[in-house]
Amino acid sequence: MKYWGTALLGAFCVFFFTPNTAYAMHIAEGFLPAGWCLFWLALSVPFVFWGIRSIHISLRGNPHLKMLLGLAGAFVFVLSALKIPSVTGSCSHPTGVGLGAILFGPAVMSVLGCIVLLFQALLLAHGGITTLGANVFSMGVMGPLVSYGVYQLLKKRNTKVAVFLAASLGNMTTYMVTSLQLAMAFPDKTGNLLVSFFKFMSIFAITQIPLAITEGLLTVFVFNLLNNYREELYPGLPKEERSGPYDFVN
């Protein structure tokens, strides 16, 4: 599992990574007016606190999940660091939040998303501190909520299809929300919010639809690896104790 996973992620990085540093990941530092920065921050904070509580409850009853939680966070960090310049002040990239939402639920991903976005803003100059709330809301809140809902709705019919659609639609949701955030901050000259939204979304779609499909396929691959090696991840743990939103261990 270790070698196959490393090889796949390495190939994915080589294919999608671009050295262009002129664009910031997500919404760039200073790009949103202060009022909108505060607005999105206020919307994101309750979800982050909800996620902290959820992580505390999960790890208190199942401390062995720390490694899996770290893996979900690393998956988000690696995939969301692969950027393709798109709309001015932002860019297109995979998000990686679908896997964690499937395994742990949407609340946990708000915390992991916040940590990843903060590290990337501080260490990689991707995104920003002032726009952290907006980026957390799009990638750490709305994307995982859709991914989790899609997976729960379809998992009993076909698990692989459910994982693929959950990851892909979670990715697209992130960019729909980002387009809405940009449209609200920078409406069309006519003042029509929908016109501005569809302008941003149409530009994102050129790169984001192929990325969403690719992320869905990669997430299915990683999900299957985790499922196949669950005995190694949980040595000696009775099957009846493998419960919770992390479905692959059931």
Swiss-Prot record:
A single GO BP: cobalamin biosynthetic process
Entry keyword annotation includes Aminoacyl-tRNA synthetase: no
Superkingdom assignment: Bacteria
GO molecular function: cobalt ion transmembrane transporter activity
GO CC terms, sorted: ATP-binding cassette (ABC) transporter complex
TM ranges: 32-52, 67-87, 99-119, 122-142, 161-181, 203-223
Pathway assigned in UniProt: Cofactor biosynthesis; adenosylcobalamin biosynthesis
Subcellular location: Cell membrane
Signal sequence range: 1-24
Principal location class: membrane
Membrane-topology descriptor: Multi-pass membrane protein
Swiss-Prot/TrEMBL keywords: Cell membrane, Cobalamin biosynthesis, Cobalt, Cobalt transport, Ion transport, Membrane, Signal, Transmembrane, Transmembrane helix, Transport
HAMAP family: CbiM
Biological function: Part of the energy-coupling factor (ECF) transporter complex CbiMNOQ involved in cobalt import.
Annotated NCBIfam families: cbiM (TIGR00123), PRK08319.1 (NF006184)
UniProt subunit comment: Forms an energy-coupling factor (ECF) transporter complex composed of an ATP-binding protein (A component, CbiO), a transmembrane protein (T component, CbiQ) and 2 possible substrate-capture proteins (S components, CbiM and CbiN) of unknown stoichimetry.
Family: Belongs to the CbiM family.
Protein name: Cobalt transport protein CbiM
Species whose genome carries this gene: Desulforamulus reducens (strain ATCC BAA-1160 / DSM 100696 / MI-1)
